[in-house]
Swiss-Prot record:
Record function comment: Conversion of NADPH, generated by peripheral catabolic pathways, to NADH, which can enter the respiratory chain for energy generation.
EC number: 1.6.1.1
Binding partners and assembly: Homooctamer. Forms a polymeric filamentous structure in purified form.
Name the record gives this protein: Soluble pyridine nucleotide transhydrogenase
Protein family per UniProt: Belongs to the class-I pyridine nucleotide-disulfide oxidoreductase family.
GO biological-process terms attached to the record: 2-oxoglutarate metabolic process; NADP metabolic process
Domain of life according to the entry: Bacteria
Source organism of the structure: Azotobacter vinelandii
Cellular localization per UniProt: Cytoplasm
Binding site residues for FAD: D35, D36, R37, P38, Q39, V40, G41, G42, N43, C44
Keywords: Cytoplasm, FAD, Flavoprotein, NAD, NADP, Oxidoreductase
Length: 464
């Protein structure tokens, strides 16, 4: 059995693992990474963020073509199968794997492909697909194994028409009707994707509002646009059982309703990938959702073992995971790169997309903060009119006395890009965080960024 010695070993090569490995090696540490796939990238690259966003982009292009009057001069609306649009995602995945493999090679980071489990707090065994076992010894470890869809025991995921958010990427046909159980971020994103392909979607939500962590106005806008695209949203519903048939699936709800569709997508919760790590050998225990508890330095209860990304829970975003991994390595190397990651913008890739940072109106009202609102509707923006993307708005929440920006919420074309301008100003200290920045700054024209100036004027006009 081969034995290798390192300063830092990172388990997982998703965003958190990559961030940790790169920061540790830049600090002069000898680093290795382990992944249970035969390629780097983690769930983010192979099953999550990258394929779903590539799918969304392809579907959005189809929708633009079908909805643009200019193209009606060429021919009738065109429809593509799910398998067709998935091909573009596969190409993006291959490019991402190639790029990330190069990152590890250029930085002289050793890569091991196999299942890692702890023998003790300084040793792991890596079991490769061919059965070969290697031992890695390290001073510190970073657990960045990510998460997977939660699967309740009473749902038969071996049935060929029942999927979760990982296996849906193996769907070989386009269903006429699809049931999505779970209206969180992933459920709403896939509802947008499939409805854009002409699929009738039933979106089952066990709450009374979609994505209730969002600003209420943004959540309402999402509900409207999903319904406008033939998504039937059913709130306050819970499943009783899922019945798989030869030609479809019947969802039995506790309310007594029955819904039949060609396929069923379970999208209700995720669990951390900790069950194969041998945590019991080092005195660690994951919670009921498979997540590992860490302190503000991303250190677990075992002093030389850290964790980052989805495996520690909130916020379960690729962007935050990378920074968490980088910060965990910063804690290990003490190279001043540590920070607790809590100022995280939300990006939701529905159609139209959503992004936000800071406080919502509900939160500010509950805290009795004297705020005001400035809005810019995209239908009045020249760039949105040119792009035929008139749905959406930018909303700025600011303190009515100091003009400090308290929250930015965006729904529509390029929302996930637009939000970062507001985030940058919000992160300025003291009087530099002010609504007046957008009044006193010249924006390119026509741009979507110009919405900040329009929203700022709108907000100032509400003051007296």
């Amino acid at each position: 059995m081969a034995v290798y010695n390192y300063d830092v070993v990172v388990i997982g090569t998703g965003p958190a693992g990559e961030g940790a490995a790169m920061n540790a090696v830049k600090a002069g540490r000898k680093v290795a990474v382990v992944d249970d796939r035969p390629q780097v990238g983690g769930n983010c690259t192979h099953l999550g963020t990258i394929p779903s966003k590539a799918l969304r982009h392809s579907v959005r292009q189809i929708m633009q073509y079908n909805n643009n009057p200019l193209f009606r001069q060429i021919g009738e609306p065109r429809w593509f199968s799910f398998a067709d649009v998935l091909k573009s995602a596969e190409q993006v995945i291959a490019k991402q794997v190639s790029s990330r493999t190069g990152y590890y090679a250029r930085n002289r980071i050793d890569t091991f492909f196999g299942t890692a489990s702890f023998c003790d707090e300084h040793t792991i065994e890596v079991v490769h697909l061919n059965g070969m076992v290697e031992t890695l010894v390290a001073k510190q470890f970073v657990i960045a194994t990510g998460s997977r869809p939660y699967r309740p025991a009473d749902v038969d995921f071996t049935h060929p028409r029942i999927y979760d958010s990982d296996t849906i990427l193996s769907l070989g046909h386009t269903p006429r009707r699809l049931i999505i159980y779970g209206a969180g971020v992933i459920g709403c994103e896939y509802a947008s994707i499939f409805s854009g392909l002409g699929v009738l979607v039933d979106l089952i939500d066990n709450r009374d509002q979609l994505l209730s962590f969002l600003d209420d106005e943004i959540s309402d806008s999402l509900s409207y646009h999903l319904r406008n695209n033939n998504v039937l949203i059913r709130h306050n519903e819970e499943y009783e059982r899922v019945e798989g048939l030869d030609n479809g699936v019947i969802l039995h709800l506790k309310s007594g309703k029955k819904i039949k569709a060609d396929a069923f997508l379970w999208s209700n919760g995720r669990t951390g990938n900790t069950d194969k790590l041998g945590l019991e050998n080092i005195g660690l225990k994951a919670n009921g959702r498979g997540q590992i508890q860490v302190d503000e330095h991303y250190r677990t209860e075992v002093s030389n073992i850290y964790a980052a990304g989805d495996v520690i829970g909130w916020p379960s975003l690729a962007s935050a995971a990378y920074d968490q991994g980088r910060s965990a390595a910063g804690s290990i190397t003490e190279n001043d790169s540590w920070r607790f990651v809590d100022d995280v913008p939300t990006g939701i890739y529905t159609i139209p997309e959503i992004s936000s940072v800071g406080k919502t109106e509900r939160e500010l009202t509950q805290a009795k903060v004297p705020y005001e609102v400035g809005k810019a509707f995209f239908k009045g923006m020249a760039r949105a009119q040119i792009a035929v993307e008139k749905a959406g708005m930018l909303k700025i929440l600011f303190h009515r006395e100091t003009l400090e920006i308290l929250g930015v919420h965006c729904f529509g074309y390029q929302a996930s890009e637009i939000v970062h301008i507001g985030q940058a100003i919000m992160n300025q200290k003291g009087e530099a965080n002010t609504l007046k920045y957008f009044i006193n700054t010249t924006f390119n024209y026509p741009t979507m960024a110009e919405a900040y100036r329009v929203a700022a004027y709108d907000g100032l006009n509400r003051l007296f």
